[in-house]
Every structure is written in structure tokens, then in C-alpha cells.
Amino acid sequence: MAKQIQAIRGMNDILPTQSPLWQKVEAVLRSSVSAFGYSEIRTPIVESTDLFKRSIGEVTDIVEKEMYTFEDRNSDSLTLRPEGTASTVRAGNEHGLLYNQEQRLWYMGPMFRHERPQKGRYRQFHQFGVEVYGIGSADIDAEVLMLSARLWDLLGIKEHVALELNTLGDPAERAAYRDALIAFLEQHKDKLDEDSQRRMYSNPLRVLDSKDPQVQAILGDAPALMDYLGEDSKTHFSTLCELLDAVGIQYTINPRLVRGLDYYNRTVFEWVTTSLGSQGTVLAGGRYDGLVGQLGGKDTPAVGFAMGLERIVLLLETLELTSDIAPEVDVYVTAMGENCVVEAIKVAQELRQQLPTLKVMSHCGGGNFKKQMKRADKSGAQFALIIGENEIANNQVAIKPLRTNNEQQLVTRSELVAKIAELI
């Protein structure tokens, strides 16, 4: 027997028993962005490597360690997309969507990072994101946070997530703070862990995000970014906080929140949970006003967020919030004998045509009554329709409940559609 080929480590199959929960999450995401008037954009999963080097930053962990990069037959360097924002900006610039225009966009699809697989973190993962271009005021920051809060309401996890906010100021303010932070870190260099020492000059703000307890203790005396902000940045942030207060969205200001990508400025935020252990972030984003210009377009204000679907699914499973998933099949149509197959197929087709949202599965492959009812039960259907020679002779169909103890009932063929519509 030939050796069985396995899935690549960290790239998982979503099996038929799992897909209904995924479909529920995806439906909530789609309905939420639709309610806010956002439009979908779909981009390729493979992009030029330079796109991510220029957007994410060459000294970030993603570019240095985690990207799936290869040369094609033309010796061009290509990369499987590790996130969605850069591709969205590239598409917007390329197709003239962003020049002097406002755009509210969303995307959903697979992303790729060569990380160590662990709970809630995989090498292929699915990301949902929202991007707004052309609006620089704090009210649009509030809108994307309101949209994200709506997701938790609809998914039933509002009480299990919390919003953290910070502001990074504009590039000039951040540069002044960067110099002050480097000067502070140099005084404590011998006490920093290896990662923080490496980042101290290349990306010092990421040291604020260190998970090392000793580094965090040192940072207790570090200069505060808020002290380096100008009036415009302070006003933008305070306005955002006032708007969130006005609509009842609770938040915590976290001065250590910096985000892992180089392109953020001013507002940054994360929705976190304590229900997934170390992988606590379920949605993150912020403002990136310089990215469109950085990738060859006209300078354009922008704000957005991204969330990993695997973590949302894991959170719902952890909290045992999966019981309301709709069944894959509503009605299972059986044919009790070869002479009944044609009639059974006609019944199934009539139900699908008359009740377009009804999920109808027909039994195929023959078999006795016991076998067919076993298949019907395994399908998850609420009802089995039994079509035998007696039923055909009397122009009837038997409706057998599979999930309750209610009695089986006979209805005429002319009554069937209305009766099923009433029962489902």
C-alpha cells in the first residue's frame, strides 16, 4: 500500500462536522459589514515579496522569519500573503479606488505564516478584515470599533472579550519618543532578554510588547509615549474615547499596546479574551495613514482591523456556544424499494423547488428500511420522508420525526409541501 500523504504541519482541514460552525461565524461577519455599508474586495493569495517588505517592515518578525517566500520560473520573488491590509492597499492603488475617494472595504480568506503551530495559531489561517480609506477623523475609528463590537453581540461572546486602546501619535512624535526610549533601554541593556536587545535599535517600540517579566518590570520606569504627543494626536484620541463612551463601548487604555506591524500610527486597538490562555488577542487593528503613500499612492488616511477566524471558532467551542448551529439537512427522503426511487426523487425535487431554503437529502444506493433510517438519523435531519409502495398507491407520504418522540403521520402528496413548511 502506498504511503498516505498528510496535510502540511500547521495547515488544517476543516471537516464536515466543523464547517457548520465556520459557516455561522462567516454569516455573522458578512451580515455585520453589510449593515454598515461596507463592500467586499478579493485579492490574490500570492503577491510580490516587496509588497510586504515595504508595508509590514523588513525588521519585523513576519518578514524576517515567518513569510512563505519563493522564486517563480521568472526568478521573481513571490510570497503567500501573511496579512490582508497590504494587498488591499496594493489593489486600491492599482485600480484607482483610493485617489480622492472614500472606501469602506472588507475581505475574508486564507493567510500564511511559518510560525510554530499551537492552539489558535496556525501556518495557514483564515482572516477577516475591514479597511476604511479617505477619512482621517476619529469618528471613523469609532465606527470600525462599533462594527467589531457588533460581532461579539451577534456571536454571543460580548461578556468574554475586552477592548484595549492606545495611541502611537504621528511619525514625528513617534520618532522623538523612539529616541527617548532607546536612550532609556541603553541604560538597562544588560538586563534585557535577547529579543529585546535585538529590537532595541531596529524596532524599539516592540520592546514595550515584550512578554518577559523582567523586561516589563524595567519598562515601569520607561518614558511614556503620551508625553510626546502633540495637540492634534491628543485631540484625536480623546475624541475617539468620547465617542466610544457615548455609544456605551467599554475600553481600557493600555500604554504598552503598540501592535506588531510598522505601518500603524495614532489609534491602535485590540480585543482580548482570557478564555484562550496565552493566545488572548481575537481582533486587532488601528490607523495607518502613511501606508497608501508608502506603497506608491497618494497619501490617504486609513483605519481598519483584522481577526483570525480560527481563534473565534476556538473561543466559541471553548465557551460551548455551538448548540444553536443549524443542521446540514432538514429532510431526508427515503425510497422503500426499487419501484419507489422515481417517486422519491420527484418528491425531493418538488420540495427543493417549492421551498428553496429547505435542506433536502435523498437516499441513494438502495437498502432495506433499517439501513435507510440509520442513514436518515446519521444525516442530522429533523424528519424522514418514507415513500413505499403503499404510500405511492394511496398518493401519500409518511413523515417520521427523527429528533422528537412525536408520532409518524401520513399526508397526501398535495399537502406535503405546506406540511413540511409548517414543521420546519
UniProtKB/Swiss-Prot annotation:
Keyword Cytoplasm: yes
Presence of keyword ATP-binding: yes
Xref: Pfam families: HGTP_anticodon (PF03129), tRNA-synt_His (PF13393)
Subcellular location: Cytoplasm
Gene Ontology annotations for the cellular component aspect, listed alphabetically: cytoplasm
Gene3D superfamilies: Anticodon-binding domain, Bira Bifunctional Protein, Domain 2
Keywords: Aminoacyl-tRNA synthetase, ATP-binding, Cytoplasm, Ligase, Nucleotide-binding, Protein biosynthesis
PROSITE patterns named in the record: AA_TRNA_LIGASE_II (PS50862)
Family the UniProt entry places it in: Belongs to the class-II aminoacyl-tRNA synthetase family.
PANTHER family on file: HISTIDINE--TRNA LIGASE, MITOCHONDRIAL-RELATED, HISTIDYL-TRNA SYNTHETASE
Classification via HAMAP family: His_tRNA_synth
Entry protein name: Histidine--tRNA ligase
Native source species: Shewanella frigidimarina (strain NCIMB 400)
